[in-house]
């Protein structure tokens, strides 16, 4: 098993959710799982809505990105989480 870089797309529940606070919660949650958060980008979508794209580095293992996605989806201000890119390092 190797190391993978994963780009996730995290959608907040509304445009009113503070981008910086959500990014900090995402980073804290990921790092509490002993996963490295390399970068976080925030991209505007429409009507004030935005998406947060954390880039994480983790060990390739059974279950893939599911544990991380579930942990982030359980955050109060998160509507949805999906993997948009996975590559072996």
From Swiss-Prot:
This is Elongation factor 1-beta. InterPro entries: eEF-1beta-like_sf, EF1B_bsu/dsu_GNE, Transl_elong_EF1B/ribsomal_bS6, Transl_elong_EF1B_B_arc. It comes from Methanococcus aeolicus (strain ATCC BAA-1280 / DSM 17508 / OCM 812 / Nankai-3). Promotes the exchange of GDP for GTP in EF-1-alpha/GDP, thus allowing the regeneration of EF-1-alpha/GTP that could then be used to form the ternary complex EF-1-alpha/GTP/AAtRNA. PANTHER family: ELONGATION FACTOR 1-BETA. Belongs to the EF-1-beta/EF-1-delta family. HAMAP family: EF1_beta. One of its GO terms (molecular function) is translation elongation factor activity. Gene3D superfamilies: 3.30.70.60. The lineage of its organism: Archaea, Methanobacteriati, Methanobacteriota, Methanomada group, Methanococci. Keywords: Elongation factor, Protein biosynthesis. The keyword Protein biosynthesis applies.
């Amino acid at each position: 098993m190797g190391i993978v870089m994963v780009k996730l797309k995290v959608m907040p529940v509304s445009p009113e959710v503070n981008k910086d606070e959500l990014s900090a919660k995402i980073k804290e949650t990921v790092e509490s799982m002993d996963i490295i958060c390399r970068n976080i980008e925030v991209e505007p979508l429409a009507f004030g809505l935005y998406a947060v794209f954390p880039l994480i580095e983790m060990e390739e293992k059974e279950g893939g990105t599911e544990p991380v996605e579930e942990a982030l989806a359980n955050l109060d201000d998160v509507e949805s989480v999906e993997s948009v890119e996975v590559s072996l390092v």
